[in-house]
Structure formats: C-alpha cells, structure tokens
Amino acid sequence: SFAVGSSYGAAPDPLEAQREVCELNPDCDELADHIGFQEAYRRFYGPV
C-alpha cells in the first residue's frame, strides 16, 4: 500500500507555497535570512 508522506518519493513541503511568497517579497526574504523563514513569514503574513 502507499502512504502519503511515506519515505517513498519526495513528499511535498507543506510550507513551500508560503516560502515562495516570502521569497518574492524582498523585505520578507531579507528578514528570513536573519530570523528564519517561518518567523519572517509570520511577521509579514500572520501565522504559518
């Protein structure tokens, strides 16, 4: 059987969409370099 999120194949990163949004915002991207993506995203867009 196949389980979603199993070790077979590359499981999609649930935060990938938010990471892309932050990377497209120069201010969020810069802040992420200093405090990490999740915290930078939270400051700009609210809870991840």
Curated annotation (Swiss-Prot):
GO terms for molecular function: calcium ion binding; hormone activity; hydroxyapatite binding; structural constituent of bone. SUPFAM superfamilies: GLA-domain (SSF57630). Keywords: Biomineralization, Calcium, Disulfide bond, Gamma-carboxyglutamic acid, Hormone, Metal-binding, Secreted. Residues 1-46 form the Gla domain. One of its GO terms (biological process) is bone development. Ca(2+) 2 binds at E20, E23. It is found in: Secreted. Its main location: secreted. One of its GO terms (cellular component) is extracellular region. Ca(2+) 1 binds at E16. Disulfide bonds join C22-C28. Gamma-carboxyglutamate residues are formed by vitamin K dependent carboxylation by GGCX. These residues are essential for the binding of calcium. SMART domains: GLA. The modification 4-carboxyglutamate is found at E16, E20, E23. Ca(2+) 3 binds at E23, D29. The carboxylated form is one of the main organic components of the bone matrix, which constitutes 1-2% of the total bone protein. The carboxylated form binds strongly to apatite and calcium. Belongs to the osteocalcin/matrix Gla protein family. This is Osteocalcin. The lineage of its organism: Eukaryota, Metazoa, Chordata, Craniata, Vertebrata.
